[in-house]
Amino acid sequence: RRKANAVTGRDLITLDLDNIPAGGTDDVLRRLEALNCGYCVYSTRKHMPAAPRLRVLLPLSRTCSADEYEPCARRMADLIGMELADQTTFEACRLMYWPSCSSDSQYVFHYTDREMLSVDWLLSTYEDWHDITSWPALPGAAALARPAAKQGDPLTKSGVVGAFCRVY
C-alpha cells in the first residue's frame, strides 16, 4: 500500500516541475546541466510549450531513508528553482507513473550520465537537517510541519493508562 509510513527508502529524487513559465523548458535544462550530477528529465502528460511540465529524476549515491528524502528533495528543488516545483513533489510516498505523451504533444527527454548525487552531501548543506524550519520552502507556502504520528488504540495501551481506558 502507498502510505507515508510504509516507505523504507528512495534511490531517486523525483521532482515534478509544474510551474515553469511559458517557453522555460530550455532554462530548466540549462539549470540541470549546471548541477554536474547525473539526471534524467522528461515531459509529463500535460506538457505544452506554453505550459511546460517536466519530471526530473536524480539518482542517489545510496538509498536515503524516508526521513532524509524530503530535505534532500527540497535542497535539489532549491538549486534548480524552488518556484518551479509542485507542492506535493517532496513527499517520499508520492507515486510517479511511466512517461507518456499525447499524440499531439511535444515530448521532451534528456539525460546526463554523471556521478550520482550524494545524499550525505545534500544533508550536509543543512546545519541540522532534522530542523524542518531550515528546509527550503515554496514561495507563499504555509510553514512546514511534520504530521503527528497516529495515536494507538487506547484499549491496547499498557500500564495504568491502558487499565483506565479498558475500564472506562
Name the predicted role of every residue range.
Residues 62, 77-147:
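Catalytic "initiation/cleavage/transfer" segments centered on a nucleophilic residue
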